[in-house]
């Protein structure tokens, strides 16, 4: 796009000779709002409008600029005076110059003057006839002798003229035509040369009338009064005749200086210079006064009103701009939904419900693209400005050569509800038993595998978790895949996560294949599954729809072969191709921190060829690939399209779902990664909101508001994201869950210090702290909870929230007994003979000793006997003997009260 040319306001003001305030006011009247600042830019259209309005001011400025010619005019008379003297000395040579200058047809004035000179020559030839046959040099000597009296006047002018006389004589001796640029001086020389021949003509100075006094002096000394009169008359005639061909500006200037310079001063030089400078300065001042003060003085009050109105408008604009800025968000493209809600100052539940109304399935930690962010922000009345990371060069795809395109394997994602047999089905296909290695028998990571069919075709499988906490993982799998397989248990039907998986696949625009699993069970009912799918607008081919379906059994292997054939058939229809010769690009599936090797990233190469030693940029991290492993852990040297791979060498753990790309140089990758880290860091600062007075008031109104701070560490980024998403959903009006920090890797010392400073608990998901870290946690009193199953972590935090780690303990009084007698027995201690007055006394219950209404001891029963028989419980109306652990100070009439403590969970 060609940018429209603009002009700064200060430049316009100089060109049009108008103040910037006036320009801003006029543009405002024309409907253009422009700030009254020198650097404000206006368009050419606005400049044309201003040029038409202020054309007079521009013309005034041009006329004022022309006054500078007066300074050059002062110099010209000096030059003319200097020219007169040498011209008289070189009178015979000037005749030759005149003959040469006749060849110049450009200027009319010299031709007219020449005719007049010829007339004078007709009068004087008899006097000069004897001198004509002599050489020119001799004539110069003869002429110099009669002009001796004129040399007496030269000393008066030598101080100003002597140097330039020499220059003019040299120019006349060398050439009279060489310099054509100062054409205006040509006729001047001719005029003054003629004045030198006939002293009446030398006074002509037709162009420069200011110097007519100088020839007068020369005329008085060298000629008679009659000659003077004769010279004055042709002088006026020459001025009138030569005024036509000469420049009009000089004629006007001559007329200006006639009455002022000549009438008042008889001396030619000193008065001229002084008066001309004053005149020029006065005229400049008067002109500038007209230009600068004419309009402003006349409308000074108007301008004051305009300034006040402009100031008020600027203040209103500033207030309006501040209000707009408050509704303008500066975000990166891939920001989490929770961070977006924090920036807009709305609750995450409100944002999620709005997304549901818009037909968008969004989780708390799901990163939103630019379109989704714009739509959501618009619903809440915000404008979005995206911060550019300067990655346009990364988005530019290399032009694919059709010869380099080769067929690639399809990427298939298996999705569905939890416990519907997704991983078991994949186990049968791969002849492995992955489910036995997963904690709790459920998939908690997104796995990437490669399978070779009997026909030799390759298929890349992505196994996604089915638990509701792993919504973001399923969304990433749907975006990454070519074909989606929805696994539904034939005995369970369509479940909530089944619907969610179908919606993810639809939003991603990928083909769907329905796999009805557990067909080997007697209660399997595939027709019911198809009916439920029909209610979701998913019609299988058996019901006249477009979606393929296949009944399978992960135990017996029924229908698995047919399912693979349908996958390959769908892939053929898609005509999947990729270029294996260009630099690799793809998506990060998972990222983890391996204690012995460093950051390990699981990626899916979607295009190009990835090799060891390539510089890779993934999200905000980069690095040179040190090693590559396939899904079985075997080292490989390169990976082509549709190949799942694990790579080592990144300087950090990228987020699951980040795009990766092989870069040309390490410097390029480092620069982009640094920019992204800066933006993410700034984004984190902006999303951290401090408590406000309104929030304090809300918490005081609730009365028992509490906040649960959590530091979350996990083995892979996907699990950390899923667990963080689930925990944030537990927040209520009374209890707020805050994830202070989340990351990939083991629990380290910095996590303990952060927890100690912020009164937080640490949750580790499939990670363990090192012994020094555990000791530091015990020293600081920091609680570390470790989990391997996401269910347990969520449930424990939920329970902790209900009681904030201190469940309510209810005390139930079971009975009481009064002390009737005291017995001291050696080896046993004090035994109280009691009578149960209420309830029952149970040996395992706690008791308290009450004397005169005051509790003096709380403990447990050591022995409880009825007669000599040890009892577990004594009911009302019976006597018993009670001995208390570590307490012998019993007295008659003491009351022994039995009670039990029962923990009651506080419900939210």
UniProtKB/Swiss-Prot annotation:
Residues 407-577 form the tr-type G domain. Residues 463-466 are annotated as: G3. Signal peptide: none annotated. Keywords: Cytoplasm, GTP-binding, Initiation factor, Nucleotide-binding, Protein biosynthesis. GTP binds at residues 416-423, 463-467, 517-520. One of the essential components for the initiation of protein synthesis. Protects formylmethionyl-tRNA from spontaneous hydrolysis and promotes its binding to the 30S ribosomal subunits. Also involved in the hydrolysis of GTP during the formation of the 70S ribosomal complex. Belongs to the TRAFAC class translation factor GTPase superfamily. Classic translation factor GTPase family. IF-2 subfamily. PANTHER family: TR-TYPE G DOMAIN-CONTAINING PROTEIN, TRANSLATION INITIATION FACTOR IF-2-RELATED. This is Translation initiation factor IF-2. It comes from Amoebophilus asiaticus (strain 5a2). The lineage of its organism: Bacteria, Pseudomonadati, Bacteroidota, Cytophagia, Cytophagales. The gene is infB.
């Amino acid at each position: 796009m060609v940018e429209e040319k603009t002009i700064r306001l200060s430049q316009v003001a100089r060109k049009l000779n108008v103040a910037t305030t006036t320009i801003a006011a006029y543009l405002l009247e024309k409907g253009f709002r422009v700030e009254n600042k020198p650097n404000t830019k206006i368009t050419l259209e606005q400049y044309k409008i201003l040029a038409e309005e202020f054309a007079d001011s521009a013309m005034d400025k041009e006329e004022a600029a022309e006054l500078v010619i007066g300074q050059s005019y002062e110099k010209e008379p000096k030059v003319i005076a200097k020219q007169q003297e040498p011209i008289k000395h070189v009178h015979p040579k000037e005749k030759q110059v005149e003959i040469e200058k006749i060849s110049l047809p450009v200027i009319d004035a010299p031709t007219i003057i020449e005719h007049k000179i010829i007339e004078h020559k007709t009068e004087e030839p008899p006097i000069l006839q004897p001198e004509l046959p002599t050489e020119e040099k001799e004539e110069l000597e003869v002429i110099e002798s009669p002009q001796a009296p004129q040399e007496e006047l030269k000393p008066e002018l030598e101080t100003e003229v002597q140097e330039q006389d020499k220059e003019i004589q040299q120019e006349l001796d060398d050439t009279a035509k060489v310099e054509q640029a100062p054409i205006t001086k040509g006729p001047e020389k001719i005029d003054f040369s003629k004045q030198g021949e006939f002293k009446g003509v030398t006074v002509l100075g037709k162009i420069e009338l200011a110097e007519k006094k100088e020839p007068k002096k020369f005329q008085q000394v060298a000629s008679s009064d009659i000659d003077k009169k004769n010279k004055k008359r042709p002088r006026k005639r020459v001025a009138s005749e030569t005024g036509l061909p000469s420049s009009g500006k000089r004629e006007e200037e001559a007329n200006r200086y006639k009455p002022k310079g000549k009438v008042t001063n008889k001396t030619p030089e000193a008065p001229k210079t002084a008066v001309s400078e004053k005149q020029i300065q006065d005229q400049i001042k008067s002109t500038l006064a007209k230009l600068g003060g004419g309009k402003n003085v006349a409308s000074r009050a108007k301008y004051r009103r305009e300034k006040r109105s402009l100031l008020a408008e600027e203040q209103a604009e500033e207030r309006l701009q501040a209000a707009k800025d408050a509704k303008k968000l500066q975000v990166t493209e891939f920001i989490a939904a929770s961070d977006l809600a924090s920036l807009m100052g709305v609750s995450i539940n409100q944002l999620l419900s709005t997304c549901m109304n818009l037909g968008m399935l969004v989780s708390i930690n799901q990163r939103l693209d630019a379109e989704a962010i714009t739509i959501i922000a618009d619903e809440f009345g915000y404008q979005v400005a995206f911060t550019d990371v300067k990655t346009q060069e990364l988005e530019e795809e290399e032009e694919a050569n059709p010869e380099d395109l080769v067929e690639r394997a399809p990427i298939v994602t298996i999705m569905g509800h939890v416990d519907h047999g997704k991983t078991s089905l994949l186990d049968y296909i791969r002849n492995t038993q992955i489910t036995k290695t997963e904690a709790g028998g459920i998939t908690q990571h997104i796995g990437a595998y490669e399978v070779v069919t009997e026909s030799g075709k390759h298929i890349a499988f992505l196994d996604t978790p089915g638990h509701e906490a792993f919504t973001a993982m399923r969304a990433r799998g749907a975006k990454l895949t070519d074909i989606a397989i929805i696994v539904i248990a034939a005995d369970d039907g369509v479940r909530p996560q089944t619907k969610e998986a179908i919606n993810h696949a639809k939003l991603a625009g990928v083909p769907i294949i329905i796999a009805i699993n557990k067909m080997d069970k007697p209660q399997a009912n595939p027709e019911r599954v198809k009916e439920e799918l029909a209610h979701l607008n998913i019609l299988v081919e058996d019901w006249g729809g477009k979606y393929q379906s296949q009944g399978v059994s992960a135990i017996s292997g029924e229908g698995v072969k047919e399912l693979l054939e349908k996958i390959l058939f769908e892939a053929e229809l898609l005509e999947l191709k990729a270029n294996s010769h260009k630099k690799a690009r793809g998506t990060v599936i998972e990222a983890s921190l391996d204690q012995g090797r460093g950051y390990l990233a699981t990626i899916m190469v979607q295009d190009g060829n990835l090799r060891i030693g390539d510089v890779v940029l993934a999200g905000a991290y980069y690095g040179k690939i040190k090693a590559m492993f396939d899904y079985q852990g075997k080292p490989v040297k390169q990976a082509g399209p549709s190949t799942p791979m694990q790579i080592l060498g990144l300087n950090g753990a990228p987020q699951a779902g980040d795009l990766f790309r092989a870069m040309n140089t390490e410097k390029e990758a480092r620069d982009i990664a640094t920019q992204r880290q800066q933006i993410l860091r700034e984004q984190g600062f902006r999303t951290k909101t401090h408590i406000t007075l309104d929030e304090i008031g809300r918490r005081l109104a609730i009365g028992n508001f509490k906040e649960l701070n959590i530091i979350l560490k996990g083995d892979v980024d996907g699990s950390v994201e899923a667990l963080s998403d689930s925990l944030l959903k537990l927040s209520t009006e009374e209890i707020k869950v805050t994830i202070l920090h989340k990351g990939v890797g083991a629990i380290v010392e910095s996590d303990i210090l952060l927890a100690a400073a912020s009164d937080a608990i640490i949750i580790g998901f499939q990670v363990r702290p090192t012994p020094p870290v555990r000791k530091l946690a015990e020293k600081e009193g920091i609680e570390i909870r470790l989990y391997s199953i996401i269910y347990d972590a969520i449930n424990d935090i939920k329970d902790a929230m209900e009681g904030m780690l201190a469940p309510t303990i209810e005390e139930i009084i079971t009975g009481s007994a009064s002390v009737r007698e005291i017995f001291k027995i050696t080896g046993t201690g004090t035994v109280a003979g009691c009578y149960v007055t209420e309830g029952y006394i149970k040996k395992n219950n706690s008791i308290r000793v009450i004397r005169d209404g005051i509790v003096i001891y709380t403990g447990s029963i050591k022995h409880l006997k009825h007669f000599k028989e040890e009892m577990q419980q004594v009911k009302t109306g019976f006597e018993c003997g009670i001995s208390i652990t570590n307490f012998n100070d019993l007295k008659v009439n003491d009351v022994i009260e039995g009670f039990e403590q029962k923990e009651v969970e506080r419900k939210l």
